Amino acid sequence: MAGIKALVALSFSGALGLTFLLLGCALEQFGQYWPMFVLIFYILSPIPNLIARRHADDTESSNACRELAYFLTTGIVVSAYGLPVVLARKAVIQWGAAGLVMAGNCVIFLTILGFFLIFGGGDDFSWEQW
């Protein structure tokens, strides 16, 4: 039952993060849908770690494949935070919309991290807890 509660909490936090993102786009005073491009970063962020977890050997203390995956994931996450700032600096979107998108980024990336911390400990394909 603990797995179900964790899954419900993660889905609620994901919905909250997407609500912040949609508010940053759809409110009447903002009205620009350019910040929706951060959805691409949400989709891309777990992929390097999934690939590295699948192909990495855990016997070494330092693993180049896993460290490259951490580097790529960091670049994707920083890009998700940088896109609204660049759009706001170029006056494509307003700063209020950028703030809402960044709040959504925080919630979504913490949700992704929470998913892998809760459900990712075991084999490469150990999603059987839920």
UniProtKB/Swiss-Prot annotation:
Chain segments annotated as transmembrane: 7-27, 32-52, 68-88, 99-119
Gene Ontology cellular-component terms for this entry are: endosome; endosome membrane; Golgi membrane
Q: Name one Pfam family in it.
A: Vps55
Where is it localised?
Golgi apparatus membrane; Endosome membrane
Source superkingdom: Eukaryota
Q: How does it sit in the membrane?
A: Multi-pass membrane protein
Keyword Endoplasmic reticulum, does the record have it?
no
Presence of the UniProt keyword Transmembrane helix in the record: yes
Q: Which UniProt keywords apply?
A: Endosome, Golgi apparatus, Membrane, Transmembrane, Transmembrane helix
* Main location group: Golgi
> Tell me, what does this protein do in biology?
Involved in protein trafficking. May be involved in the down-regulation of membrane protein levels.
Q: Which family does it belong to?
A: Belongs to the OB-RGRP/VPS55 family.
| Name the record gives this protein | Leptin receptor gene-related protein
